[in-house]
Amino acid sequence: MANSAQAKKRARQNEKRELHNASQRSAVRTAVKKILKSLQANDSSAAQSAYQHAVQILDKAAGRRIIHPNKAARLKSRLSQKIKNLSSSQ
């Protein structure tokens, strides 16, 4: 339990930041799912546009350390590989 005023304030700030970070992580997951959904539908153009949007979200989240930068790089790499494979198979 926070006893000092400073500790109480930090607890309030952490709660607020936790909620914001959770929404940012959710946005990352939603963006990735949108790409995977368009890949399953074999829609190359939709996957490309969703990928460009997801890259922005991933880079912002990684820059703010909401997700690890290596995880963002890994996701971008794997998703671009899947899009490339879809484009080459069509």
Swiss-Prot record:
GO molecular function, one term: small ribosomal subunit rRNA binding
Single biological process term from Gene Ontology: translation
Signal peptide location: none
Record GO cellular component, one term: cytosol
UniProt KW keywords: Ribonucleoprotein, Ribosomal protein, RNA-binding, rRNA-binding
One Pfam entry name: Ribosomal_S20p
Alphabetized InterPro entries for the sequence: Ribosomal_bS20, Ribosomal_bS20_sf
Keyword check for rRNA-binding: yes
Lineage: superkingdom: Bacteria
PANTHER family attached to this UniProt entry: 30S RIBOSOMAL PROTEIN S20, SMALL RIBOSOMAL SUBUNIT PROTEIN BS20C
Family named by the database record: Belongs to the bacterial ribosomal protein bS20 family.
Record's function text: Binds directly to 16S ribosomal RNA.
Protein name from the UniProt record: Small ribosomal subunit protein bS20
Organism: Coxiella burnetii (strain RSA 493 / Nine Mile phase I)
Gene name tied to this protein: rpsT
